Amino acid sequence: MLTAASIGASSLAAPLIARDSALMVAGLQAMGTLINTSDDALWMIRPRPLAGPATVDCGLAGTVMRFLPPLAGTATGPITFDGDDYARQRPMAPLLRALTALGVRVDDAGRGALPFTVTGTGRVTGGEVTIDSSASSQFLSGLLLSAPEYDRGLVVRHEGPPVPSSPHLRMTVDMLRTAGAAVDDSRPDVWEVEPGRLTGRGWQIEPDLSNAAPFLAAALVTGGTVTVPGWPLRTSQPGDLLRGLFTELGGRVTLGPDGLTVAGTGMLHGIDVDLSEAGELTPVVAALCALADSPSTLRGIGHLRGHETDRLAALTDQLNGLGGDVTADEDGLRIRPRRLRGGVFDTYADHRMAQAAAVVGLAVAGVELSDVACTSKTLPRFPLMWADLLGERP
């Protein structure tokens, strides 16, 4: 996103090779950006004027469906967005209303969801806009990432319940500043981005820490030790909260030059925790809580009902289907440990649900994932990596 709106070429070192990344690349290419991904270790990006007609396949990627439409407003011509069946159920209305308020033409037949078409005129005036981003921080990030391209920049005000996953917003602001944007986030729930062209540069991509959750969780379940190399000593990623969470759950967690190491103690303890800043960790944490020695409460995650699937309902149904005792309410989950049994664990085409099922399967014989291939969304090698971890790869 940032490189497509920059002056000059950019490079991405150590990019995440996954379906979500491929969809973002394809979407930008469809709009005119030149991207060379022939080297998995180093992608090269050269910006060009954006134009339609074009069609963007969002798959199930919230980043694609929420980051690219604000940029499409600066293109010339129609850009049509669509995605997987589950993606058509994900909330989009607040972002589409914000774009309309900024003068961008959006045609969604009143759905407030995929599919829709953004018809750009080559420029967006910008100015001020108010949005309720309580369903997803991605609405705000999408607007902020394109704001430097708008003639007057952008002042975005959030009005509504608290924005979830705030570390993602901090990451957005940090990266905008690194790219040369002037961003003022000193006022609560207000972000101001000055207009101006960003500068192409080399980006070193951090490892996706949230994808480490099931592997580190394996140490807690089995009483073993797992090390994830390359864990950054300083990061704004929500996945870094795993260090504190897994300590509370009963693990011994050490961060050093060799990476992050989690050692299991043979015991899992229930927790009472607010996961509003890292809702993506909920499925794996819920799986661990279902195996713990005392009840758990996971709070601040009502927004997960609008993720790849309704994760609160999905976790409740699937864990209870294995004999668990899980209750979902408006804000989160209440989990009371019970002796679990084997059975089919439906992933709902959701990569995080598949990770949760794999964790449960470490402690419960006969757990069958309905669709492990859905992990390709963010980690295509998950099945092989999991087999390697367990020493089961042929």
Regions found by a protein language model. Give the residues of each.
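Short, structured segments at the rim of ligand-binding sites
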Residues: 1-394
